[in-house]
Amino acid sequence: MSVMFDPQAAIYPFPPKPTPLNDDEKQFYREKIKRLLKERNAVMVAHYYTDPEIQQLAEETGGCISDSLEMARFGAKHAASTLLVAGVRFMGETAKILSPEKNILMPTLAAECSLDLGCPIDEFSAFCDAHPDRTVVVYANTSAAVKARADWVVTSSIAVELIEHLDSLGEKIIWAPDRHLGNYVQKQTGADVLCWQGACIVHDEFKTQALTRLKKIYPDAALLVHPESPQSIVEMADAVGSTSQLIKAAKTLPHRQLIVATDRGIFYKMQQAVPEKELLEAPTAGEGATCRSCAHCPWMAMNGLKAIAEGLEQGGAAHEIQVDAALREGALLPLNRMLDFAATLRA
């Protein structure tokens, strides 16, 4: 008898923490990376959740700091022949899908994502096959194989609008892999949404009791929440949105103090946007519980200066992203659908 894969029961081993560098070592690797970027005709694209020193280096070298989709779009438009992707593996895959002619390097190919790991292609395909009447919508935080199985790829920034659109056409939805984001979208739209039961290990750890206590300490603070968080956290929020939307909310909200319920890597760009405001981390544990991620993705933390330098210098199988041609073709279709839909929203 086959056993159904249960994303909620899955335990993902965390990678070891990178060895800290002293100031001299940091400066050595920063200069080495700058030199290698020029030698390789490369540009660095970094996610909001990488460490501040990585984001700063991307800025200094003419690169990009953004969400996963904008990272890939920036890379596709840039003249560089090589992209150094500081993030997790699905981000490198997305960049390769959109820029197959470019050399896509990563500091390490072992940088995973719990949402990606929690949606293995064989089990997900069987799930989709069991519901053939539903349109398959998958989050960007998935493998190339899962994207190729989908009808649409979506980011959190346009998830509500896309599901509203599909619902208006009378379509029923399979949503994967994040159950919290799927539930949020369903409540916002009223659509018929069947959710795969994955979750982000960082956002899944935010706790209402601990957050309530923090709100009592800072009663005038606004709460900014990423919709990958549990429903109980989302319901407490003053603003809910994607990484880029939360940064915009930080600027528009009048509050001088902001409690932020997402990966603390976002604080680098958010603090730049609102230097006059105080940013507070939402708690990820409480009532005797201990956090595992402590509001920072352990795989994002693998993108250290030494690893980036090694990726640029060595390349090869340990650092270069490859996507099977057939998978790329299959994944490109739902990605392009999303890009075209997003363009209509901006028009």
Curated annotation (Swiss-Prot):
This is Quinolinate synthase. It catalyses: iminosuccinate + dihydroxyacetone phosphate = quinolinate + phosphate + 2 H2O + H(+). Its main location: cytoplasm. Binds 1 [4Fe-4S] cluster per subunit. [4Fe-4S] cluster binds at residues 113, 200, 297. It is an enzyme of class 2 (transferase). SUPFAM superfamilies: NadA-like. Coiled coil: none annotated. One of its GO terms (cellular component) is cytosol. Keywords: 4Fe-4S, Cytoplasm, Iron, Iron-sulfur, Metal-binding, Pyridine nucleotide biosynthesis, Transferase. Signal peptide: none annotated. The keyword Cytoplasm applies. Iminosuccinate binds at residues 47, 68, 139-141, 156, 226-228, 243. Belongs to the quinolinate synthase family. Type 1 subfamily. Its EC number is 2.5.1.72. Pathway: Cofactor biosynthesis; NAD(+) biosynthesis; quinolinate from iminoaspartate: step 1/1.
